[in-house]
Amino acid sequence: MAHKFHITPAANEQFKFDFSYNGEKIFWSENYKQKASAKSAIESLKKNAPGAATADLSKDETGSGYRFEIVKSKDDQFFVRFVASNGETMVRTETYKQKASATNAIESLKKNGPGADVADEA
């Protein structure tokens, strides 16, 4: 299987999406009130993720515009969020024990997101 975006139903007649590989979710979104908004967010990721900078917040780095942020959790694990130019988080990952796993998630979306199919399962 290839990398793919999946749009699925969420609570309260809303929609969410994820970016996965072989059925394993790498990134997932918040809920959207309209399916069109979820589709728009996916298109924004496809367009903006490949050239986005990475700010490692665990090293007190900062960033602006479209960017990936590596965040250290309270239990010394790491997760990634992709932030839009307006400062809103678009998607995030699970927490990883190793920062390298967080970096791999970023590289996967940068490399494989633009060409990934979108499966509308909602």
Residue ranges and their predicted role:
Residues M1-N12, K47-D75:
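N-terminal segment of the canonical double-stranded RNA-binding domain
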Residues H6-T8, K16-S20, E24-Y32, A41-L45, ...:
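A structural feature that tracks compact, well-ordered secondary-structure segments
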Residues F27-K33, A53-D60, M90-Q98, D117-A122:
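Short, tandemly repeated low-complexity microdomains enriched for cysteine and small residues
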Residues K35-E61, N104-A119:
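A low-complexity, Ser/Thr/Gly/Pro-enriched, surface-exposed linker/loop concept
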